[in-house]
């Protein structure tokens, strides 16, 4: 038996749309948002936006290692490669402030080459010196042997229309 007092009225909204949320929602492109003040495990940003914030007990270990490593070594590389276009942080008066990242790579991008590495630790170590805009790092045992390691513009395709793209 479930008591009716356990149900929440539909008119009660858990999260309120802020001015910053409204400004971000004016952008019609697919991107991610990261709330610097909330931390990686806070899911409130995901209520209105595609976000890299959020908690799940079964979070991908490699993602967590990537986040942990780059959050210490190179935040910009982390945000760019995860398509974080908007960051929410605090200004000097401790008020929420919106920051835009014009260098976000997008949902997908073309690379020139692949560097094969032998272990996840080696992959993390190579992150700090690798231009992820141009080079992909791949675990040696996870890629078919017939995949080329160098690419050029004739290898690209053009996506004309995205169907079923979520605005959120």
Question: How does the language model describe each region?
Answer:
Residues 3, 57-58, 66:
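Generic signal for short, ordered secondary-structure residues
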Residues 24-25, 46, 53-59, 73-168:
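Flexible, solvent-exposed extracytoplasmic
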Residues 1-54, 99:
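Extracytoplasmic
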